[in-house]
Amino acid sequence: MIQYHKGRDKNMYTKAELLNLYNMDLDALLNESKKYLKDEVEFCSIINARNGKCSQNCKYCAQSSHYNTEIESYPLMEVNEVLEAARDSQKNGADRVAIVTSGKTPDESDFDTMLDMIKTLNKEGIKSCASIGILNENQAKKLAETGLVRFHHNINTCRSYHPEICTTHTYEDRINTAKLVKKYGMELCCGVIIGMGESIEQRIEMALELAEINPDSIPVNILTPIPNTPFADYGDKIDEENILRTLAIFKIACPEASIRIAGG
């Protein structure tokens, strides 16, 4: 097993070390990751509060206006609609409820409505989360002041592979949003999508970049290929064994974070 370098943080691995772990016997790797697991499971739920017509060209996404995915698009839901959906989620066992919207970043009017949604959920005693795109400093500050508990914003992939995924915003845009969330004291949920054609080495890069960001929660989405997107035929880019290896590596690299398994 890997020996830690003297004088460094015990959780900071090198790329070579994580790659060695990734390629070891699967049972041994899973046993190593179990050292960091808690005997508990969390459930979260999302409310798709605005759907479709996104200006960004993320190659995996059904909501991008760049691809003819034939999804139903609708504008931002009303506050009372979100509240009813959140109550249903809570009754069904969700530990927290996230307001999720399509689009790069909300305009001022929609953002004010989102703040009202968060206030309403907080009054109801529902743990609030939001996934509303790339933030500026003023938006991050207002979300924190409103009492948002957690903000979700994925890095989606590693820095070296980002240009293969999206060209309408930068990797740094995503990193800056994560930094703003932490700056204003909110919990950060920040993860990736795997199975998009990235290499094993690039999955290791994802783990290291997430370890640097230090989120509270890491959703690991396994790509669900969407017809008529550029990744429509990517259903065979990762198998079950490599999914398990990736999950184990993420837990080893980020032992304090909750690892969430998702489809995306």
Task: Label every model-predicted segment.
Residues 8, 43-81:
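Canonical Radical SAM [4Fe-4S] cluster-binding loop centered on the CxxxCxxC motif
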Residues 14-44:
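An N-cap/entry alpha-helix motif that binds or orients negatively charged groups
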Residues 66-85, 89-178, 186-191, 216-221:
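Core AdoMet radical
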Residues 101-104, 229-239:
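Glycine-rich phosphate-binding "P-loop"
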Residues 123-125, 150, 172-230, 244-260:
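Conserved C-terminal portion of the radical SAM core fold
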Residues 236-238, 258-264:
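Active-site-adjacent loop and "lid" segments of alpha/beta metabolic enzymes
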